[in-house]
């Protein structure tokens, strides 16, 4: 009887389940797709005909440009610190109104010497050194789109490339501002000519997760006092 009741309850709950509706996110291309221009077809030149002398460089919103990413950077720094401090204090009472010859003055002190009553010295020394070296090298080729044309004629570009191999995502994102005159005749531009460049090359997957320390190790490193 209990099994029958449980079966009825399960069927009732299954019938009340709401079907999950997947929300479609607009693609990158749809977000930047410009409105198609309208042309009047003539008897000689059609709208789809390419001009005889046409510059194929990107110039309008939505046009594609090829970016040659060549980023090389190296830096090194070295620091050395050496400090030392010495202090010495001594005191003696060779003459004290004739009392230094009195046997009662130093009677309570064993082996007391008035010429050497107090002596102290301190010595502090610290040495430290450090060095750091960093080198980066990123070579890639990707295409980007003109997202906006500024009033001064410069272009805002943005590109994204996602490559997935064996459930490992490699994501390359580029953003920046370029000048039209820096674009070569073959519609390419070097990343060194991009102002306010933001280049990100990251990865998601098992390999990327294994390269990061665990959460407990991060906590121990944060609170470890030594």
Swiss-Prot record:
Keywords: Bacterial flagellum, Cell outer membrane, Lipoprotein, Membrane, Palmitate, Signal. It is found in: Cell outer membrane; Bacterial flagellum basal body. A lipid is attached at residue 16 (S-diacylglycerol cysteine). One of its GO terms (molecular function) is cytoskeletal motor activity. It is a lipid-anchor. One of its GO terms (biological process) is bacterial-type flagellum-dependent cell motility. GO terms for cellular component: bacterial-type flagellum basal body, distal rod, L ring; cell outer membrane. InterPro entries: Flag_Lring. Residues 1-15 form the signal peptide. A lipid is attached at residue 16 (N-palmitoyl cysteine). It comes from the Bacteria. PANTHER family: FLAGELLAR L-RING PROTEIN (PTHR34933:SF1). The basal body constitutes a major portion of the flagellar organelle and consists of four rings (L,P,S, and M) mounted on a central rod. Assembles around the rod to form the L-ring and probably protects the motor/basal body from shearing forces during rotation. Belongs to the FlgH family. This is Flagellar L-ring protein.
């Amino acid at each position: 009887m209990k099994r029958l009741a449980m079966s009825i309850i399960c069927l009732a709950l299954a019938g009340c389940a709401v079907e999950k509706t997947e929300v479609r996110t607009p693609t990158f291309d749809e977000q930047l797709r410009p409105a198609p221009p309208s042309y009047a077809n003539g008897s000689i030149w059609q709208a789809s005909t390419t001009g005889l002398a046409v510059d194929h460089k990107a110039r309008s919103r939505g046009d594609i440009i090829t970016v040659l990413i060549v980023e090389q950077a190296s830096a090194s720094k070295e620091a050395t610190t050496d400090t030392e401090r010495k202090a010495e204090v001594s005191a003696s009472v060779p003459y004290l109104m004739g009392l230094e010859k009195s046997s009662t003055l130093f009677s309570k002190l064993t082996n007391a010497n008035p010429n050497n009553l107090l002596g102290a010295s301190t010595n502090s020394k610290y040495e430290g050194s450090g060095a750091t070296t960093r080198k980066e090298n990123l070579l890639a080729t990707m295409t980007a789109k003109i997202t906006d044309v500024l009033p001064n004629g410069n272009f805002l570009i943005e590109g994204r490339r996602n490559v997935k191999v064996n459930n490992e995502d490699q994501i390359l994102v580029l953003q920046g501002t370029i000048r039209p005159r820096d674009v070569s005749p073959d519609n390419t531009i070097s990343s060194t000519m991009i102002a306010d460049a933001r280049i990100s090359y990251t990865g998601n997957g098992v390999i990327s997760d294994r390269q990061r320390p665990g959460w407990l190790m991060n906590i121990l490193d944060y609170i470890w006092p030594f």
